[in-house]
């Protein structure tokens, strides 16, 4: 994942500072400041990475770092980025589907003419995803009496449960 993105970006004349895996947020932020980074990219291969990405976005906001944050990797998604990561910071957060799309996204983010359109489209997409997510979780509660009136009718009168067979072997009821 991240290694492929690094190679693809480097082949397109971008300088990539690869800090490795499981790097603390503080180290990434310090490196971004030290190298005057234009973009920070995070890759998530395992599920716990998703929470770390949210924490990292919070730290970027706390530090006042406004540069774009690219999100990618096997466990990531547009929906997770829109619902969990993007709202945690005021700067741009862009989910990139795969390594081949990292170059056009990076190019657009660094081009003053393309950047506004990309960010506007991304934010509109994220807003729609957040709205859909919110609606999905808003299910009206059915009153207890209505739920009881709608129960499955089962006639228990006269029902005799089967008696378990005695002994070993396969049995049929």
What is the predicted role of each segment?
Residues 92-98:
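Short acidic-hydrophobic, aromatic-tinged amphipathic segments that line or gate anion-handling sites
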Residues 1-4, 50, 148-155:
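Charged, low-complexity, helix/coiled-coil-prone segments
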Residues 2-12, 17-88:
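Cofactor-cradling patches in redox/metallo enzymes
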Residues 98-173:
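Active-site loops and adjacent core secondary-structure elements that bind or stabilize anionic groups
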């Amino acid at each position: 994942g991240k290694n492929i993105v690094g190679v693809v970006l480097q082949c397109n004349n971008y300088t990539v500072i690869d800090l490795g895996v499981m790097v603390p947020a503080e180290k990434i932020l310090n490196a971004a400041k030290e190298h005057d980074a234009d973009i920070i990219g995070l890759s998530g291969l395992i599920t716990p990475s998703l929470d770390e990405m949210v924490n990292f976005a919070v730290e970027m906001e706390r530090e006042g770092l406004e540069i774009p944050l690219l999100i990618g990797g096997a466990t990531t998604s547009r929906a997770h980025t829109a619902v969990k990561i993007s709202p945690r910071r005021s700067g741009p957060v862009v989910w990139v589907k795969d390594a081949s799309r990292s170059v056009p996204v990076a190019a657009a983010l660094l081009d003053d003419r393309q950047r506004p359109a990309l960010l506007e489209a991304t934010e509109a997409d994220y807003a729609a995803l957040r709205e859909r997510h919110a609606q999905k979780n808003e299910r009206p509660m059915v009153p207890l009496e209505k739920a009881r009136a709608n129960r499955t009718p089962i006639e228990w009168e006269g029902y005799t449960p089967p008696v378990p067979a005695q002994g070993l072997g396969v049995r049929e009821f």
